């Protein structure tokens, strides 16, 4: 399958999602666990598989995508390629569900991983540096970056007349502890404003090797990813409000969404709108996003399982179609195109997993 800069949206003929075709469900789903629930051996096994993906050669060619140097980079490149469709859109939730499943599948098939994709429960770890995910030990996802005195607070304006000052994080420099110390990332950085453009920037796949930077920010995770926020999210009466709260767009009851702020809590590279998969914690963060969507869907199966809302492009750009269950999305070299109705249940279609 080729690598394209444009997402193709076509109609699928099957009406399985409407109950007119069989929708088989698996009987014995794999269970995805929170990182803190894993044994030492299971954490080390997952870390080893991630490092394996970094060591394996890419399937994309350097001639086609100059920045790729590893199989891991293939996944980042695919995410970049579809960024202008898959964020703050009706595609966001199902596309990322499938993307992290493809990552889990690659870990198993290409790197001998026998476990399931762990997730990061934001609520459990209000002190990030003390958490088993980011304490910098050999069984963590590495720790904070070195202190960078030049990092400054950030001002956000999520709504007219509303300014939020985000205090700076604790680090701001290269990650030097844990299994991913001196981790090299090759793509980006991207300016956030580039997400509003109609096409990817010319530098999208330029080779730019540098260290992974983190700046752990407890204020962010405690303010925007706490139990109250999660409860509000799960109390959403419909997919419109669920997406608004999760993403903070377009009309959120809370000003910033836990998806974006989970990214922000780890610093600039995890916050990169296009290239965030380069931080190994990306997969655990999006595991939590998918877990909450799953819990919300399960709470009202008949009405929520196949609920979709939104445009097929980031920021609901003008003259782009609304998504339907027949909308087909692409994953580049990672997989064949998939209609959204195949991606709506973690225990049907290609999937067979659940969460603790």
Curated annotation (Swiss-Prot):
Glycosylation sites noted in the Swiss-Prot or TrEMBL record: 81, 148, 193, 226, 309
Pfam families, per database record: Tyrosinase
Signal sequence, start to end: 1-19
Domain of life of the organism encoding this protein: Eukaryota
Entry keywords, A to Z: Copper, Endoplasmic reticulum, Glycoprotein, Golgi apparatus, Metal-binding, Oxidoreductase, Signal
Compartments where located: Endoplasmic reticulum lumen; Golgi apparatus lumen
Cysteines engaged in disulfide bonds, as pairs: none
Catalytic reaction(s) noted: aspulvinone E + O2 = (5Z)-3-(3,4-dihydroxyphenyl)-5-[(3,4-dihydroxyphenyl)methylidene]-5-oxo-2,5-dihydrofuran-3-olate; aspulvinone E + O2 = (2Z)-2-[(3,4-dioxocyclohexa-1,5-dien-1-yl)methylidene]-4-(4-hydroxyphenyl)-5-oxo-2,5-dihydrofuran-3-olate + H2O
Activity modulation: Activity is inhibited by the presence of dithiothreitol (DTT).
pH influence on activity: Optimum pH is 5-7.
Induction info: Expression is induced during conidiation.
Cofactor names: Cu(2+)
Binding site for Cu cation A: 87, 96
Entry GO MF terms: metal ion binding; oxidoreductase activity
UniProt: Cu cation B binding residues: 203, 263, 286
GO terms under cellular component: endoplasmic reticulum lumen; Golgi lumen
Pathway assignment: Secondary metabolite biosynthesis
Consequence of gene loss (knockout): Impairs the production of Asp-melanin. Results in yellow fluorescent conidia and accumulates aspulvinone E in conidia.
Post-translational modification: Glycosylated.
E.C. no: 1.14.18.-
Cofactor: how bound: Binds 2 copper ions per subunit.
Function summary: Tyrosinase; part of the gene cluster that mediates the biosynthesis of Asp-melanin, a pigment that confers resistance against UV light and hampers phagocytosis by soil amoeba. The nonribosomal peptide synthase melA converts 4-hydroxyphenylpyruvate (4-HPPA) to aspulvinone E. The tyrosinase tyrP then performs hydroxylations of both aromatic moieties of aspulvinone E. The product of tyrP is highly unstable, and, due to the high reactivity of methides and ortho-diquinones, the polymeric Asp-melanin forms spontaneously.
Family: Belongs to the tyrosinase family.
Protein name as annotated: Tyrosinase P
Top-level taxonomy: Eukaryota, Fungi, Dikarya, Ascomycota, Pezizomycotina
């Amino acid at each position: 399958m080729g690598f394209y800069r444009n997402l193709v949206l076509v109609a699928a003929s099957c009406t399985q999602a409407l109950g007119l075709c069989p929708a088989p469900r698996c009987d014995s789903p794999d269970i995805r666990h929170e990182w803190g629930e894993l044994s030492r051996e299971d954490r080390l096994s997952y870390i080893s598989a991630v490092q394996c993906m970094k060591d394996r050669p890419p399937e994309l060619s350097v001639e086609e995508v100059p920045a790729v140097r590893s199989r891991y980079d293939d996944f980042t490149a695919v995410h970049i390629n579809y960024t202008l469709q898959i964020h703050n859109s009706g595609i966001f939730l199902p596309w990322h569900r499938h993307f992290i499943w493809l990552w889990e599948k690659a870990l198993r098939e290409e790197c001998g991983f026998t476990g399931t994709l762990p997730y990061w429960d934001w609520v459990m770890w209000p002190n990030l540096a003390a958490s088993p995910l980011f304490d910098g030990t050999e069984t963590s996802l590495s720790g904070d970056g070195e202190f960078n005195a030049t990092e400054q607070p950030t001002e956000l304006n999520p709504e007219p007349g509303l300014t939020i000052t985000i205090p700076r994080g604790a680090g701001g420099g290269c990650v030097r502890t844990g299994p991913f110390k001196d981790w090299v990332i090759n793509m980006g950085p991207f300016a956030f404003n580039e997400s509003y453009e109609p096409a990817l920037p010319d530098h999208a796949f330029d080779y730019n090797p540098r260290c992974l930077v983190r700046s752990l920010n407890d204020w962010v995770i405690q303010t925007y990813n706490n139990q109250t926020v999660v409860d509000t999210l799960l109390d959403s009466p419909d997919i419109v409000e669920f997406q608004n709260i999760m993403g903070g767009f377009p009309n959120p009851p809370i000003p910033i969404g836990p998806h974006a702020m989970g990214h922000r809590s780890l610093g600039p590279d995890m916050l990169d709108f296009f290239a965030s998969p380069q931080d190994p914690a990306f997969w655990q963060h999006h595991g939590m996003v998918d877990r909450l969507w799953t819990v919300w869907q399960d709470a009202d199966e008949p009405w929520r399982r196949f609920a979709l809302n939104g445009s097929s492009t980031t920021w609901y750009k003008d003259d782009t179609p609304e998504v339907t269950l027949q909308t087909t999305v692409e994953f580049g070299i990672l997989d064949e195109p998939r209609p959204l109705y195949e991606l709506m249940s973690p225990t049907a279609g290609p999937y067979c997993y659940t969460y603790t």
